[in-house]
């Protein structure tokens, strides 16, 4: 699947190739994974201890308000304000 336009902000820091981390962790296979568990990437404590799983409800909230869902996380992204953009990014993440 092609990345939606809203994913442009994500790819500034995230790769979609397995094992290829950028400033942020690779998003390959992220859907369904427990937050903060990707091997080979140093997550912030708040992220690693969040206990979240990247499913549709969690991603919907997180992509709209990252700091509200995981206070103190290192991601310098304010969130997607358009629900259609959030849905498009989640659909893309499911395909990775």
UniProtKB/Swiss-Prot annotation:
PANTHER family: CYTOCHROME C (PTHR11961)
Single GO biological process annotation from the record: photosynthesis
Function recorded in the entry: Cytochrome c2 is found mainly in purple, non-sulfur, photosynthetic bacteria where it functions as the electron donor to the oxidized bacteriochlorophyll in the photophosphorylation pathway. However, it may also have a role in the respiratory chain and is found in some non-photosynthetic bacteria.
SUPFAM superfamilies according to UniProt: Cytochrome c
Identification of the protein by name: Cytochrome c2 iso-2
Family: Belongs to the cytochrome c family.
Recorded GO MF terms: electron transfer activity; heme binding; metal ion binding
Domain of life of the organism encoding this protein: Bacteria
Residues the record lists as binding heme c: 10, 13-14, 75
Keyword terms, alphabetized: Electron transport, Heme, Iron, Metal-binding, Photosynthesis, Transport
Entry comment on modification after translation: Binds 1 heme c group covalently per subunit.
Gene3D superfamilies: Cytochrome c-like domain (1.10.760.10)
